[in-house]
Swiss-Prot record:
Gene source species: Bos taurus (Bovine)
Catalytic residue list: 213 (nucleophile)
Entry-linked HAMAP family: Endonuclease_III_Nth (MF_03183)
Protein name: Endonuclease III-like protein 1
UniProt transit peptide range: 1-28
Gene Ontology cellular component list: mitochondrion; nucleus
Cellular compartment(s): Nucleus; Mitochondrion
Pfam families: HHH, HhH-GPD
Annotated site (Important for catalytic activity): 232
Keyword Oxidoreductase: no
Domain HhH stretches: 192-216
UniProt: [4Fe-4S] cluster binding residues: 283, 290, 293, 299
Amino acid sequence: MNAAGVRMVVTRARSRGTGASLRRRGEKAAPLRSGEAAAEERKSYSPVKRRRKAQRLSVAYEASEGEGGEGAEHLQAPSWQPQDWRQQLDNIRTMRSGKDAPVDQLGAEHCFDPSASPKVRRYQVLLSLMLSSQTKDQVTAGAMQRLRARGLTVDSILQTDDSTLGALIYPVGFWRSKVKYIKQTSAILQQRYDGDIPASVAELVALPGVGPKMAHLAMAVAWGTVSGIAVDTHVHRIANRLRWTKKATKSPEETRRALEEWLPRELWSEINGLLVGFGQQTCLPIRPRCQACLNRALCPAARGL
Protein backbone atom coordinates (compact mmCIF):
# COMPACT_ATOMS: atom_id res chain seq x y z
CA MET A 1 0.00 0.00 0.00
CA ASN A 2 1.39 3.47 -0.86
CA ALA A 3 1.60 6.36 1.59
CA ALA A 4 -1.58 7.98 0.31
CA GLY A 5 -3.50 4.77 0.92
CA VAL A 6 -2.18 4.57 4.50
CA ARG A 7 -3.25 8.16 5.19
CA MET A 8 -6.73 7.42 3.80
CA VAL A 9 -7.24 4.36 6.10
CA VAL A 10 -5.96 6.19 9.18
CA THR A 11 -8.10 9.26 8.47
CA ARG A 12 -11.30 7.26 8.03
CA ALA A 13 -10.59 5.06 11.06
CA ARG A 14 -10.07 8.14 13.24
CA SER A 15 -13.30 9.68 12.00
CA ARG A 16 -15.12 6.61 13.33
CA GLY A 17 -13.58 7.03 16.83
CA THR A 18 -13.08 4.26 19.37
CA GLY A 19 -16.77 3.69 20.15
CA ALA A 20 -17.22 0.98 17.52
CA SER A 21 -14.24 -0.95 18.90
CA LEU A 22 -15.63 -0.77 22.46
CA ARG A 23 -19.08 -1.84 21.31
CA ARG A 24 -17.59 -4.83 19.51
CA ARG A 25 -15.54 -6.01 22.47
CA GLY A 26 -15.88 -9.77 22.90
CA GLU A 27 -16.49 -10.46 19.15
CA LYS A 28 -14.41 -13.30 17.80
CA ALA A 29 -11.69 -12.50 15.33
CA ALA A 30 -12.40 -13.38 11.68
CA PRO A 31 -10.60 -16.56 10.56
CA LEU A 32 -7.41 -16.07 8.57
CA ARG A 33 -7.99 -15.98 4.82
CA SER A 34 -6.38 -18.51 2.52
CA GLY A 35 -3.57 -17.34 0.25
CA GLU A 36 -5.88 -17.34 -2.78
CA ALA A 37 -8.54 -15.24 -1.02
CA ALA A 38 -5.93 -12.80 0.26
CA ALA A 39 -4.51 -12.33 -3.24
CA GLU A 40 -7.99 -11.67 -4.62
CA GLU A 41 -8.57 -9.04 -1.94
CA ARG A 42 -5.33 -7.27 -2.86
CA LYS A 43 -6.45 -7.10 -6.49
CA SER A 44 -9.82 -5.56 -5.56
CA TYR A 45 -8.51 -3.29 -2.79
CA SER A 46 -10.85 -0.75 -1.29
CA PRO A 47 -10.27 1.43 1.81
CA VAL A 48 -13.56 0.26 3.36
CA LYS A 49 -12.56 -3.41 3.35
CA ARG A 50 -9.16 -2.59 4.81
CA ARG A 51 -10.72 -0.53 7.58
CA ARG A 52 -13.10 -3.35 8.62
CA LYS A 53 -10.29 -5.86 8.67
CA ALA A 54 -8.17 -3.60 10.90
CA GLN A 55 -11.07 -3.22 13.35
CA ARG A 56 -11.48 -6.98 13.67
CA LEU A 57 -7.80 -7.47 14.38
CA SER A 58 -7.98 -4.79 17.08
CA VAL A 59 -10.99 -6.47 18.73
CA ALA A 60 -9.23 -9.84 18.72
CA TYR A 61 -6.30 -8.32 20.62
CA GLU A 62 -8.57 -6.75 23.21
CA ALA A 63 -10.43 -10.03 23.77
CA SER A 64 -7.16 -11.86 24.40
CA GLU A 65 -6.41 -9.39 27.19
CA GLY A 66 -9.88 -9.63 28.74
CA GLU A 67 -11.75 -11.93 31.11
CA GLY A 68 -11.76 -15.11 29.08
CA GLY A 69 -9.31 -16.96 31.33
CA GLU A 70 -9.72 -20.10 33.39
CA GLY A 71 -12.62 -19.99 35.82
CA ALA A 72 -14.40 -17.16 33.98
CA GLU A 73 -17.56 -19.24 33.82
CA HIS A 74 -17.99 -18.80 37.58
CA LEU A 75 -18.05 -15.01 37.17
CA GLN A 76 -21.07 -15.15 34.88
CA ALA A 77 -24.59 -15.15 36.29
CA PRO A 78 -26.23 -18.57 35.85
CA SER A 79 -29.09 -18.78 33.38
CA TRP A 80 -31.30 -20.46 36.01
CA GLN A 81 -31.53 -20.41 39.80
CA PRO A 82 -34.15 -21.95 42.10
CA GLN A 83 -36.83 -19.72 43.54
CA ASP A 84 -36.23 -18.62 47.16
CA TRP A 85 -32.97 -20.56 47.38
CA ARG A 86 -31.13 -17.90 49.36
CA GLN A 87 -33.89 -17.70 51.97
CA GLN A 88 -34.03 -21.50 52.14
CA LEU A 89 -30.27 -21.65 52.62
CA ASP A 90 -30.32 -19.02 55.36
CA ASN A 91 -33.08 -20.95 57.14
CA ILE A 92 -31.02 -24.14 57.00
CA ARG A 93 -28.03 -22.27 58.42
CA THR A 94 -30.22 -21.10 61.29
CA MET A 95 -31.46 -24.63 61.98
CA ARG A 96 -27.87 -25.94 61.83
CA SER A 97 -26.34 -23.23 64.00
CA GLY A 98 -25.95 -25.62 66.94
CA LYS A 99 -23.56 -27.87 64.98
CA ASP A 100 -24.84 -30.86 66.89
CA ALA A 101 -25.55 -33.36 64.12
CA PRO A 102 -23.54 -36.60 63.89
CA VAL A 103 -21.56 -35.27 60.91
CA ASP A 104 -20.39 -32.32 63.01
CA GLN A 105 -18.69 -34.59 65.54
CA LEU A 106 -17.92 -37.76 63.58
CA GLY A 107 -17.35 -36.69 59.96
CA ALA A 108 -14.14 -37.13 57.99
CA GLU A 109 -12.69 -33.99 59.59
CA HIS A 110 -12.71 -35.76 62.97
CA CYS A 111 -11.64 -39.33 62.12
CA PHE A 112 -7.90 -38.91 61.63
CA ASP A 113 -5.11 -38.77 64.20
CA PRO A 114 -4.15 -35.08 64.57
CA SER A 115 -0.71 -36.06 65.90
CA ALA A 116 0.17 -38.10 62.81
CA SER A 117 2.28 -36.78 59.94
CA PRO A 118 0.45 -34.91 57.14
CA LYS A 119 0.85 -37.86 54.79
CA VAL A 120 -0.64 -40.31 57.31
CA ARG A 121 -3.46 -37.90 58.17
CA ARG A 122 -4.42 -37.68 54.50
CA TYR A 123 -4.41 -41.45 54.21
CA GLN A 124 -6.64 -41.76 57.26
CA VAL A 125 -9.06 -39.19 55.81
CA LEU A 126 -9.34 -41.22 52.62
CA LEU A 127 -9.92 -44.48 54.51
CA SER A 128 -12.62 -42.92 56.66
CA LEU A 129 -14.40 -41.76 53.50
CA MET A 130 -14.14 -45.22 51.94
CA LEU A 131 -15.66 -46.72 55.09
CA SER A 132 -18.44 -44.12 55.26
CA SER A 133 -20.30 -45.24 52.14
CA GLN A 134 -23.73 -46.65 53.09
CA THR A 135 -22.72 -46.38 56.75
CA LYS A 136 -23.81 -44.17 59.64
CA ASP A 137 -21.22 -41.74 60.95
CA GLN A 138 -21.20 -43.42 64.37
CA VAL A 139 -20.30 -46.79 62.82
CA THR A 140 -17.58 -45.27 60.64
CA ALA A 141 -16.06 -43.46 63.62
CA GLY A 142 -15.99 -46.68 65.64
CA ALA A 143 -14.20 -48.55 62.85
CA MET A 144 -11.65 -45.76 62.52
CA GLN A 145 -10.95 -45.83 66.25
CA ARG A 146 -10.23 -49.57 66.10
CA LEU A 147 -7.95 -49.14 63.09
CA ARG A 148 -6.08 -46.22 64.62
CA ALA A 149 -5.49 -48.17 67.83
CA ARG A 150 -3.30 -50.54 65.80
CA GLY A 151 -1.44 -47.73 64.03
CA LEU A 152 -3.29 -46.80 60.86
CA THR A 153 -0.78 -46.36 58.02
CA VAL A 154 -0.42 -47.73 54.51
CA ASP A 155 2.18 -50.23 55.70
CA SER A 156 0.15 -51.42 58.69
CA ILE A 157 -2.92 -52.04 56.51
CA LEU A 158 -0.91 -54.01 53.94
CA GLN A 159 0.55 -56.12 56.75
CA THR A 160 -2.92 -56.91 58.17
CA ASP A 161 -4.59 -60.07 56.86
CA ASP A 162 -8.05 -59.76 55.33
CA SER A 163 -9.92 -61.53 58.13
CA THR A 164 -8.41 -59.28 60.80
CA LEU A 165 -9.12 -56.16 58.73
CA GLY A 166 -12.70 -57.33 58.23
CA ALA A 167 -13.17 -57.78 61.97
CA LEU A 168 -11.81 -54.29 62.62
CA ILE A 169 -14.12 -52.48 60.21
CA TYR A 170 -17.27 -54.56 60.78
CA PRO A 171 -20.17 -53.60 60.81
CA VAL A 172 -19.68 -50.88 58.17
CA GLY A 173 -21.84 -51.34 55.11
CA PHE A 174 -20.46 -53.79 52.50
CA TRP A 175 -17.49 -54.48 54.76
CA ARG A 176 -16.26 -57.48 52.74
CA SER A 177 -15.98 -55.40 49.57
CA LYS A 178 -14.34 -52.59 51.52
CA VAL A 179 -11.64 -54.94 52.82
CA LYS A 180 -10.72 -55.68 49.20
CA TYR A 181 -10.87 -52.04 48.12
CA ILE A 182 -8.81 -50.82 51.09
CA LYS A 183 -6.09 -53.37 50.39
CA GLN A 184 -5.99 -52.60 46.66
CA THR A 185 -5.98 -48.84 47.18
CA SER A 186 -3.30 -49.03 49.87
CA ALA A 187 -1.05 -51.05 47.56
CA ILE A 188 -1.48 -48.46 44.79
CA LEU A 189 -0.71 -45.61 47.18
CA GLN A 190 2.45 -47.34 48.34
CA GLN A 191 3.65 -48.12 44.82
CA ARG A 192 2.71 -44.91 43.00
CA TYR A 193 2.38 -42.16 45.60
CA ASP A 194 4.97 -43.04 48.27
CA GLY A 195 2.18 -43.76 50.75
CA ASP A 196 0.40 -40.46 50.17
CA ILE A 197 -2.94 -39.92 48.44
CA PRO A 198 -3.41 -38.29 45.01
CA ALA A 199 -4.03 -34.55 44.87
CA SER A 200 -6.59 -34.56 42.06
CA VAL A 201 -10.15 -35.80 41.68
CA ALA A 202 -9.28 -37.71 38.50
CA GLU A 203 -6.58 -39.73 40.27
CA LEU A 204 -8.68 -40.27 43.39
CA VAL A 205 -11.70 -41.69 41.56
CA ALA A 206 -9.35 -44.06 39.72
CA LEU A 207 -8.62 -45.78 43.05
CA PRO A 208 -10.67 -48.90 43.89
CA GLY A 209 -13.68 -48.07 46.07
CA VAL A 210 -13.40 -44.28 45.71
CA GLY A 211 -16.32 -42.40 44.13
CA PRO A 212 -16.84 -38.73 43.22
CA LYS A 213 -18.29 -37.74 46.60
CA MET A 214 -15.33 -39.25 48.45
CA ALA A 215 -12.88 -37.64 46.02
CA HIS A 216 -14.30 -34.14 46.46
CA LEU A 217 -14.39 -34.52 50.25
CA ALA A 218 -10.83 -35.86 50.27
CA MET A 219 -9.69 -32.85 48.26
CA ALA A 220 -11.41 -30.52 50.75
CA VAL A 221 -10.44 -32.23 54.02
CA ALA A 222 -7.05 -33.71 53.16
CA TRP A 223 -5.73 -31.11 50.73
CA GLY A 224 -7.75 -28.00 51.60
CA THR A 225 -8.89 -27.61 47.99
CA VAL A 226 -12.47 -27.05 46.82
CA SER A 227 -12.75 -29.18 43.69
CA GLY A 228 -16.52 -29.59 43.54
CA ILE A 229 -19.66 -30.21 45.58
CA ALA A 230 -19.65 -33.47 47.52
CA VAL A 231 -23.11 -34.98 47.10
CA ASP A 232 -24.25 -37.95 49.18
CA THR A 233 -27.76 -39.33 49.68
CA HIS A 234 -28.69 -36.50 52.06
CA VAL A 235 -27.62 -33.72 49.69
CA HIS A 236 -29.24 -35.55 46.77
CA ARG A 237 -32.55 -35.93 48.61
CA ILE A 238 -32.71 -32.38 49.96
CA ALA A 239 -31.73 -30.77 46.66
CA ASN A 240 -34.61 -32.54 44.95
CA ARG A 241 -37.11 -31.75 47.70
CA LEU A 242 -36.24 -28.06 47.56
CA ARG A 243 -36.20 -28.16 43.74
CA TRP A 244 -32.60 -27.00 43.69
CA THR A 245 -32.14 -28.86 40.43
CA LYS A 246 -33.71 -27.63 37.21
CA LYS A 247 -35.28 -31.06 36.77
CA ALA A 248 -35.48 -34.11 39.01
CA THR A 249 -32.18 -35.97 39.26
CA LYS A 250 -31.74 -39.71 39.71
CA SER A 251 -28.28 -39.99 41.24
CA PRO A 252 -25.96 -38.02 43.53
CA GLU A 253 -23.53 -37.45 40.68
CA GLU A 254 -26.29 -36.03 38.48
CA THR A 255 -27.29 -33.78 41.37
CA ARG A 256 -23.70 -32.59 41.79
CA ARG A 257 -23.52 -31.48 38.18
CA ALA A 258 -26.91 -29.76 38.42
CA LEU A 259 -25.95 -27.86 41.60
CA GLU A 260 -22.59 -26.75 40.24
CA GLU A 261 -24.34 -25.16 37.26
CA TRP A 262 -25.89 -22.43 39.42
CA LEU A 263 -24.70 -22.51 43.04
CA PRO A 264 -22.02 -19.82 43.62
CA ARG A 265 -18.62 -21.43 43.97
CA GLU A 266 -17.93 -19.74 47.30
CA LEU A 267 -20.72 -21.89 48.79
CA TRP A 268 -19.48 -25.23 47.50
CA SER A 269 -17.33 -26.04 50.55
CA GLU A 270 -20.16 -25.27 52.97
CA ILE A 271 -23.05 -27.03 51.32
CA ASN A 272 -22.14 -30.67 52.04
CA GLY A 273 -21.80 -30.48 55.82
CA LEU A 274 -24.73 -28.09 56.06
CA LEU A 275 -27.16 -30.31 54.16
CA VAL A 276 -25.87 -33.62 55.54
CA GLY A 277 -26.53 -32.46 59.11
CA PHE A 278 -29.90 -31.04 58.07
CA GLY A 279 -30.76 -34.39 56.54
CA GLN A 280 -29.67 -36.25 59.67
CA GLN A 281 -31.77 -34.11 62.01
CA THR A 282 -34.73 -32.61 60.16
CA CYS A 283 -35.15 -33.51 56.49
CA LEU A 284 -35.15 -37.25 57.16
CA PRO A 285 -35.47 -39.83 54.36
CA ILE A 286 -38.72 -41.14 55.86
CA ARG A 287 -41.20 -38.98 57.77
CA PRO A 288 -39.25 -35.69 57.54
CA ARG A 289 -39.91 -33.28 60.39
CA CYS A 290 -41.56 -30.63 58.24
CA GLN A 291 -43.42 -29.02 61.15
CA ALA A 292 -40.09 -28.20 62.81
CA CYS A 293 -38.55 -26.91 59.58
CA LEU A 294 -38.20 -23.18 58.92
CA ASN A 295 -38.62 -23.90 55.23
CA ARG A 296 -42.01 -25.57 55.51
CA ALA A 297 -43.71 -22.63 53.75
CA LEU A 298 -40.98 -22.44 51.09
CA CYS A 299 -40.39 -26.13 50.41
CA PRO A 300 -42.24 -27.53 47.38
CA ALA A 301 -42.12 -31.05 48.82
CA ALA A 302 -43.63 -29.94 52.15
CA ARG A 303 -46.43 -28.18 50.28
CA GLY A 304 -47.07 -31.24 48.15
CA LEU A 305 -45.92 -29.57 44.92
